[in-house]
């Protein structure tokens, strides 16, 4: 972009001459700009016309002229960035920001949060880390999961606050007597983000790929065949009834991507730009459901965000503030909730070092010591777990004191960061009982394999739970390599048989009851124990409306809205009727 190049040239000039008047020749300027003297004259004239410098020449070749830089590069960069953002030129703004990435946060601060720019409501979110590739079959991060669920549609979907699957690409579905045939009826006039018509044949191609993919196959293991009996009907024939199927088709691994262009979806927002410093979403004009109120959402990746308190930035992944720096004083928590998901401790009985009784003894020590209540983590961030889900009580372990712990145990943990404090506390506690705890860290957000899990006796990690908690926990047992890694062969076989029995129960309350009973067995045996929940919170300035927390601790991009910039607005305004 020519403007960015010109600013870069001016920055080079300012670095060498400063802001004091300087006597200089055109030849010297040409050397600074790496150009001809003729071009240097043109460039100086342009910079003077823009008010960036003053230039007083003298007649005669080789005569020195008086030059003075009138503005600092930082001032110009901020001014130009504002102009580009107001014009909606996000690509130009990104190029401008890349000139000085170390000060990106300072540059962006006045433009973050909800703003009307180029006539459209835009939300800019500062984010503290680079985002993963937005592929539903590979991503692991909480922010990425939220983004992908915004970009891609499924045959069904899970809405914020609603645990039952809702229509999405399919407007209705039917289940045969016996549950072996499911038909999903597609909406007409569906469109991909690139404007191309979305066809049943394309969805069939995508589903056939998902049937064989290691990430999605566990969710679709009961599917014998997928067919297209009509252009607007997807048919699933099962070899075993699976009354979770409508839930499964709304999960991330089963979202529908374009069969030939996987980055293209059919969700409410499309991916307009995906750069290391900027991810930009734009409203999908051909979306088949109610359109979002916001037109554009931008993630500006600013790893050097200032930390001025737990609620002042996105540095902590369970604290999100929507707004610019000047708004932070006005920003108030608009939504708070305790996560249904939790960080957990898993015992690897398959490894053979810990017996079930020793595992129960270890859990008893943790519970009786109050370890989780005394972690050096603010109470506003975590809450010790007493239930796996509401009503699924974590049992208190009681075992004879004379059961000795092994002399040495190995613990493997992965993010989030709070788990590091748990490992330190565990080392101290177990040392008091003659057990040395070796701690290893894995930087990934998902266990890689059974071989990785086999290295450890104890495992610490977190488990996100979505809008349909019971369905999420059932899928966790199927999809996470943790279970095959920690369960003995007989327990693993028992788990598979239990899941097959549960999925065939047509009555949802019965499925929930049986699933709870199985998890109660796992917790009683100390195989899995939730440790603490997160306290999710979103803060926003008064002008942002409709900010609603999702189960994963983000907010529903389709519900947030921003009033247009009128002089006066009535108090207590409500969003327009749909």
Regions found by a protein language model. Give the residues of each.
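Aromatic- and charge-enriched surface segment that lines or borders ligand/interaction sites
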Residues: 18-22, 41, 140-142, 172-215
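A bilobed periplasmic-binding-protein/Venus flytrap-type ligand-binding module shared by bacterial periplasmic
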Residues: 282-285, 335-361
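Ligand-site clamp/hinge motif
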Residues: 286-328
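A structural "hinge/loop" feature
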Residues: 130-144, 196, 246-251, 539-558
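N-terminal lobe/hinge region of extracytoplasmic solute-binding protein
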Residues: 126-175
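Surface-exposed binding/hinge segments that line
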Residues: 216-262, 266-275
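Ligand/substrate-recognition segments at binding pockets and active sites
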Residues: 22-27, 33-39, 51-57, 399-462
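Detector for C-terminal structural segments
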Residues: 58, 361-395, 421-425, 454-578
């Amino acid at each position: 972009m020519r403007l960015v190049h010109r600013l870069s040239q001016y920055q080079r000039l300012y670095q060498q001459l400063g802001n004091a008047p300087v006597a200089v020749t055109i030849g010297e300027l040409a050397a600074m700009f790496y150009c001809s003297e003729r071009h240097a004259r043109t460039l100086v004239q342009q910079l003077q016309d823009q008010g960036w410098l003053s230039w007083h020449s003298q007649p005669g070749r080789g005569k020195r002229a008086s030059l003075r830089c009138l503005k600092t590069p930082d001032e110009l960069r901020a001014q130009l960035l504002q102009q580009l953002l107001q014009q909606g030129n996000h690509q130009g703004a990104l190029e401008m920001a890349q000139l000085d990435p170390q000060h990106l946060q300072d540059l962006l601060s006045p433009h973050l949060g909800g703003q009307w720019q180029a006539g459209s409501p835009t939300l800019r979110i500062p984010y503290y880390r680079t985002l993963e590739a937005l592929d539903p079959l590979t991503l692991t991060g909480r922010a990425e999961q939220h983004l992908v669920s915004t970009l891609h549609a499924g045959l069904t979907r899970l809405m914020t606050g609603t645990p039952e699957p809702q229509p999405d690409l399919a407007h209705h579905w039917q289940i045969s007597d016996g549950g072996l045939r499911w038909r999903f009826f597609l909406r007409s006039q569906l469109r991909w983000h690139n404007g191309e018509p979305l066809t049943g044949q394309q969805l069939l191609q995508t589903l056939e790929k998902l049937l064989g993919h290691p990430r999605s196959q566990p969710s679709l293991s009961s599917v014998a065949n997928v067919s297209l009996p009509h252009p607007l009907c997807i048919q699933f024939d099962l070899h075993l009834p699976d009354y979770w199927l409508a839930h499964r088709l709304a999960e991330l691994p089963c979202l529908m991507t374009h069969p030939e262009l996987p980055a293209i979806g059919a969700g409410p927002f499309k991916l307009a730009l995906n750069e290391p410093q900027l991810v930009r979403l734009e409203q999908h004009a051909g979306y088949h459901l109610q359109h979002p109120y916001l037109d554009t959402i931008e993630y500006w990746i600013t790893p050097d965000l200032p930390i001025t308190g737990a609620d002042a930035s996105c540095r902590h992944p369970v604290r999100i503030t929507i707004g610019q720096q000047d708004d932070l004083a006005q920003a108030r928590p608009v939504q708070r909730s305790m996560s249904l998901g939790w960080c957990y401790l898993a015992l690897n009985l398959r490894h053979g070092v810990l017996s079930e009784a020793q595992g129960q003894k270890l859990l008893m020590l943790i519970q009786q010591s109050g370890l989780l209540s005394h972690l050096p983590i603010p109470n506003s961030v975590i809450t010790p777990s007493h239930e796996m889900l509401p009503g699924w009580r974590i049992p208190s372990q009681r075992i004879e004191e004379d059961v000795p712990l092994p002399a040495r145990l190995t613990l493997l943990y992965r993010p989030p960061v709070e788990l590091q404090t748990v490992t330190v506390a565990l080392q101290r506690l177990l040392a008091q009982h003659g057990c040395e705890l070796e701690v290893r860290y894995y930087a990934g957000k998902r266990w890689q394999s059974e071989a990785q899990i086999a290295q450890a006796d104890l495992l610490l990690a977190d488990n996100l739970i979505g809008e349909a908690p019971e369905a999420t926990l059932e899928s966790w047992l199927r999809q996470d390599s943790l279970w095959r890694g920690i369960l003995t062969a007989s327990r693993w076989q028992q788990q598979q048989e239990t899941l097959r029995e549960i999925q065939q129960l047509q009555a949802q309350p019965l499925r929930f009851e049986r699933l709870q009973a199985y998890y109660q067995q796992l917790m009683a045996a100390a195989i899995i124990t939730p440790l603490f929940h997160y306290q999710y919170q979103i803060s926003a300035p008064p002008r942002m409306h409709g900010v609603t927390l999702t189960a994963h601790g983000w907010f529903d991009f389709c519900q947030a809205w921003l009033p247009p910039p009128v002089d006066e607005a009535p108090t207590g305004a409500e969003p327009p009727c749909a």
